């Protein structure tokens, strides 16, 4: 809205990003208590898995879920004020945000209604993810410009691969994998949102660099015209995420639920696709990938041997069972996530 006024100051990306971040954060602090109270009145409580850590049944019962509503409401309102709402990348990201959030909302709603941890049937959830990812990646493929189907590899500036139309299924895989990985990691107070903040911060740096032709040429990375609006979007997401963490930090007053986790993963995955940072994103999301692999390994080994590799999966529950406190697990995973982010950002220069 402000951007369309044409004021000179609003042409500066860093200015709009800063105020999009602050706006979303402050709005979260203002509306957060009201949303939490409303969800409590609606009895939208987190439904816990009976096979999860036993202490969660006593400590986390009665905490409202669907906290993704808080995140994305504040992000969207901030974007309306500070972003160029006509930018094609902005429109794609917003579609992904609302599409996957809607899917997660249905899942959360069914869990609350049925009073069980089994919400939307797995196949219907996957169908929804396929539909939303196919639409968004296809739009990106046809409107995304000259670099859209090319995969760039860290460390090797001259090595790249053009997937052509096969970029669409590749991009769909990134979105669905990221969405589900973030969903699996959302099990402890502040864990998933804290890791998301780290990734968002790193992607802001990447988005700013790719939006600048001079920086992109110096670092031998593609210059993505129009990607400056991703800096604004990610700034708003960063502010909204910090605002949510204010209430989600231990002991949490609200959980993001599938409404938040499914959409957050998809949003950051789509951002990586637009910025041509698909391989780099696999480093950024290292903790999420490890968490997902722990579940896959646990299931495969147990089916074949009836033995468990981990005391409990995903991996964060394994460390809880080893005696780590919840905050120890969360902060140590944040540290590991930050290390992955530093490694990922360092690859931009090492080419």
Swiss-Prot record:
Topology in the lipid bilayer: Multi-pass membrane protein
Enzyme Commission designation: 2.7.8.13
Disulphide bridges: none
The protein's required cofactors: Mg(2+)
GO biological process: cell division; cell wall organization; peptidoglycan biosynthetic process; regulation of cell shape
Keywords from the UniProt entry: Cell cycle, Cell division, Cell inner membrane, Cell membrane, Cell shape, Cell wall biogenesis/degradation, Magnesium, Membrane, Metal-binding, Peptidoglycan synthesis, Transferase, Transmembrane, Transmembrane helix
PROSITE patterns listed in its UniProt record: MRAY_1, MRAY_2
GO cellular component labels: plasma membrane
GO molecular function per UniProt: metal ion binding; phospho-N-acetylmuramoyl-pentapeptide-transferase activity; UDP-N-acetylmuramoyl-L-alanyl-D-glutamyl-meso-2,6-diaminopimelyl-D-alanyl-D-alanine:undecaprenyl-phosphate transferase activity
Pathway: Cell wall biogenesis; peptidoglycan biosynthesis
Main location: membrane
The keyword tRNA processing is assigned to this record: no
Stored PANTHER family: PHOSPHO-N-ACETYLMURAMOYL-PENTAPEPTIDE-TRANSFERASE (PTHR22926), PHOSPHO-N-ACETYLMURAMOYL-PENTAPEPTIDE-TRANSFERASE HOMOLOG (PTHR22926:SF5)
Main function: Catalyzes the initial step of the lipid cycle reactions in the biosynthesis of the cell wall peptidoglycan: transfers peptidoglycan precursor phospho-MurNAc-pentapeptide from UDP-MurNAc-pentapeptide onto the lipid carrier undecaprenyl phosphate, yielding undecaprenyl-pyrophosphoryl-MurNAc-pentapeptide, known as lipid I.
Protein name, entry field: Phospho-N-acetylmuramoyl-pentapeptide-transferase
Species of the source: Borreliella afzelii (strain PKo) (Borrelia afzelii)
